[in-house]
């Protein structure tokens, strides 16, 4: 756990203290952070990926903890893709109808006030994102740099992954989606990444909760690929398959 912007001056037991400052600013009134602060948060994420690589980890997962950060994630998604507010904004951990309308207004106002440049992902995140998103972008970038596969968690993690891919398209080659988030904007992020989640558990929870599930599936898949016998090894006659090898025989 890395603290790069929790809104408290107290030390968090067990957390790595890399606080840039206490929280970001109100995105409905101005940009969340400076461009330099965004880059600093990304560099912290890259550093965390580097540390994990040097400690011998061969797969990483990215999650976050926060309240209200589906609002910033929706704002970043709109800023990166130009999609509509209704397509990007969901109900997060659960809110009233009135709060939902306010949430959509905040995202709309954040885009109107800040005018993020969709061609500059750092500008988008600096203006309407958060330190958590910027830090996760850095982890995705760092994982790709050190050639370590990395698991996407939920909606917020997916938006960070999309921003990282917009910075460097090669990052996509190291991404592994985990669970399908119930947040409406998640599908847009996956479509933009041209990826599909492994499983759908009707979860609207981030915080890295999908990563351990994906780790297990990856481990099982590797075990099957490395240890499962081929037809030749098992001395199975596969001549009968010649008639059905064409792709058209497998597609309904």
PLM regions: where:
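N-terminal loops that bind phosphate or other acidic moieties
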Residues: 1-252
């Amino acid at each position: 756990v890395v603290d790069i912007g929790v809104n408290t001056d107290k030390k968090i037991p067990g957390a790595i203290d890399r606080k840039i400052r206490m929280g970001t600013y109100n995105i409905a009134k101005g940009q969340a952070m400076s461009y330099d602060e965004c880059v600093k948060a990304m560099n912290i994420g890259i550093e965390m990926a580097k540390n994990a690589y040097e400690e011998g980890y061969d797969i990483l997962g990215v999650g976050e903890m926060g309240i209200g950060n589906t609002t910033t994630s929706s704002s970043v998604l709109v800023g990166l893709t130009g999609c509509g507010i209704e397509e990007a904004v969901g109900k997060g951990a659960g809110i009233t109808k009135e709060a939902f309308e306010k949430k959509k207004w905040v995202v709309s106002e954040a885009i109107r006030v800040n005018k993020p440049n969709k061609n500059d992902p750092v500008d988008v995140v600096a203006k309407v994102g958060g330190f958590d998103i910027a830090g996760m972008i850095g982890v995705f970038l760092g994982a790709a740099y050190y050639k370590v596969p990395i698991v996407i968690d939920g909606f917020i993690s997916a938006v960070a992954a999309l921003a990282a891919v917009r910075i460097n398209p090669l990052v996509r080659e190291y991404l592994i989606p985990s669970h399908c988030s119930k947040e409406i904007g998640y599908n847009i992020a996956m479509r933009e990444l041209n990826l599909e989640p492994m499983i759908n558990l009707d979860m609207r929870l981030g915080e890295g909760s999908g990563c351990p599930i994906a780790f297990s599936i990856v481990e099982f898949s590797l075990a099957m690929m490395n240890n499962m016998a081929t037809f030749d090894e098992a001395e199975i006659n596969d001549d009968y398959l010649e008639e059905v090898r064409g792709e058209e025989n497998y597609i309904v």
